[in-house]
Amino acid sequence: MGEKGIRVEFAGAGRPPRMFRPGEFPRPLSPREAETLRFMLSPQDPRLDSLREQAEVAHVRGVCHCGCATIDLAVDRDRASQASALSSPVIETRTPQFDPANGPFELILHLADGWLKELEIVYYANDPPPEFP
């Protein structure tokens, strides 16, 4: 834990470290977080089967310090299998049209060594979105 209980993790090649707000963790995914994760894993590609399995036993380890909906994930590795032949980010999506009130946003699903790692929202508005759209 860093200053004021904020956890910092190195994000990997080319990405700055992400800082997570302190809180009651681990915790289950909220209904909206679980729905968003299912949406991100909905393409009918058999390579995603192990990630869908992981999503069923994933929990939240932290949330982004900026107040956005980004969540740091952990998976019960005894109850799911590791994905292979996939790199991170594994899934990305963007808003199809510009929303003047909220601006555009992107959702990105990251892996670490074949395990679900982070469900990230990238936003371009002034205020961070506190939940996934």
Stretches with model-predicted labels:
Residues 2-94, 130-133:
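N-terminal domain-onset segments
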Residues 98-133:
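Short, compact, well-ordered microdomains
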